[in-house]
Structure formats: structure tokens, C-alpha cells
């Protein structure tokens, strides 16, 4: 009953807004009840996904006029469960030239990052003369990243820049991180993404096949080593990651 009361209130609230602003649109990142109410009163809705999209129940997925997602897999998925919605990919530019740089996208909690793994991968790329940049999660409040940046004399990217902006401005050859849309965006930009997730990390909830679309530092280290030895394999590696 509390949900019904909330829904009724939202419908009344949105109806009042529509009377004042007939062409009003609602942009949100997952407000299902709001979406249902908006559709009922005839207000256009736009769902802007932030993060990897979760699988949904077709039975209770609300009607949305527009859905914006990061990957072609997500686009196909939502076109299937919501055929009357206009599903769009966020526009991303593929880079034609890359530089000898690496961006590491960090998680929001120190406890989810292994200092040992970070040190291992930093040492590896620094020995190969790559310039490495760290990108903090927008909500990060820990101390590990500053400690690592100081230890290895690394630059931390301006927190105002999002993942795509960082990739476009630095043009790295590799991006590194844990389960994140940053690595999905990286592949679309034409930059090889490397995952630091443990092999048993569960991504079954996600539409995007994250493990298939990244090189695993834990499971494909030798392949990464070979790629660094022979960068002529780069284009082939990108192509394989996009379809495997």
C-alpha cells in the first residue's frame, strides 16, 4: 500500500507539472516508479544509464521513450525487452592514434583494490616506459591512491573529467581497472582494456559480457606480455575482444 500511495502522489505531482509545462521531459537513471507514472500522464521519459546495465524482467520493465546505454549488447537487449523505446548508444569516438600511456581507473573503496596487484602492474608498465595516469572514482574518499601516486610519482587525472574525456585527451594504449563502464567505453574508443577483477568475480547480473570484452590480468597475463612485445598484434586483439 505505501508504494501505491507514492505512485498516486507522483502521478498527481507530474500531472500538475505537465499542466504548467506541456512539453516537459524527465531524465533519470533508473527511477522505475517515476517512469510508470510519467507514462501514465503522458510525459516523455529518458533513462540515462550510469554504470553497467543490469538484466531486467520484461514483465515489469517500464515503458521509456528513450534509453541511453554504453554498449551494443545493452542496446540489443533493451530493444528486445522494450521494443517501442528508442534505444541509443552514448556517442563515442574511436581513436586513430594512441600514445604510450596507461590510465588506471580505480574503484571507490580501498578494500576493493589490491595494493599488491596494483604495484605489480605498475612495475610492469613502468619498466616498459609507459606513462601511467590514475583516475579516482568520483566518490572515492580513501588513502591508498594518494599513497601509490606518491610512491610511483604518478599523475592523478582531474576528477572533473569522466572516463571518456580522460581517454580522448590522453589517448592511452591501455586502460586498466575493475568492473566498470570505463573499460567498456575504452573498447569502443579503440583502446585495449585490462581487467584486474578476480577470476571468480560474478558478472552474471550484467548485460555486457565484461569478462569477454577485457583482457584479464589474472588469467591472460601471458597474452598481455606478448602484446607488449609485439604491438602489431594490437588491432587483432581489439577485434577479438569485440566479438569473443
What are these model-predicted stretches?
Residues 1-82, 89:
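Active-site and donor-binding regions of nucleotide-sugar-utilizing enzymes
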Residues 23-25, 65, 101, 171-174:
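Conserved acidic residues
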Residues 27-32, 50, 69-72, 105-110, ...:
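Structural motif
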Residues 34-36, 74-78, 111-114, 139-147, ...:
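Short, charged/polar "capping" segments at the starts of alpha-helices
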Residues 54-64, 77-81, 96-100, 164-169, ...:
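Short, charged, surface-exposed secondary-structure boundary motifs
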Residues 64, 82-85, 181-242:
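Catalytic binding pocket for nucleotide-activated donors in carbohydrate/polymer assembly enzymes
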Residues 88-150:
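Conserved catalytic-core segment of nucleotide-activated headgroup transferases in glycan assembly
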Residues 139-189, 193, 199:
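Donor nucleotide-activated moiety binding/catalytic core segment of transferases
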